[in-house]
């Protein structure tokens, strides 16, 4: 609420950087919110730098209430993508539970590793027809 009435601007831009060594509990979401996923998929189709997007749940300890975490893999600076995705996610999520959004990079450790290696993306940019043939035939 303080972010809504404060002078800082956009309440969606609250950022918290976790120090290395802090542990988080990540898990797959059994039934992701369909309307939010559909809206984010539609959005990401219009933003070329977005390669893939994932959703999982995150909590700080066993007793904590889990939050949804949206991981976005994209080329370049993704601050603006995170802002737009946050707006769409909060507008389409039933209820008003918090949503976390982070950038994921293939090959990085920590949250990025868990998400890219253990969670199936709900959005993946389509390959061009020529490249799609290569991917399907395992040529690349």
Task: Give short role names for the model-derived ranges.
Residues 126-140:
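A cross-taxonomic marker for long C-terminal extensions/tails that follow the last structured domain
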């Amino acid at each position: 609420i303080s972010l809504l009435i404060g002078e800082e601007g956009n309440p969606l831009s609250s950022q918290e950087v976790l120090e290395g060594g802090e542990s988080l509990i990540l898990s797959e979401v059994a039934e992701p919110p369909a309307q939010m996923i559909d809206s984010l998929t539609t959005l990401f189709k219009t933003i070329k730098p977005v390669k893939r997007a994932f959703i999982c749940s995150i909590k700080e300890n066993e007793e904590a209430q889990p939050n949804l975490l949206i991981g976005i893999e994209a080329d370049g600076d993704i601050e603006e993508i995170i802002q737009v995705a946050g707006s769409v996610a909060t507008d389409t999520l039933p209820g008003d539970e918090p949503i976390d959004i982070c950038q994921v990079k293939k090959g990085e450790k920590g949250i990025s590793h868990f998400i890219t290696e253990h969670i199936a993306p709900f959005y993946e940019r389509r390959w061009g027809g020529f490249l799609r043939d290569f991917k399907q035939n395992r040529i690349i």
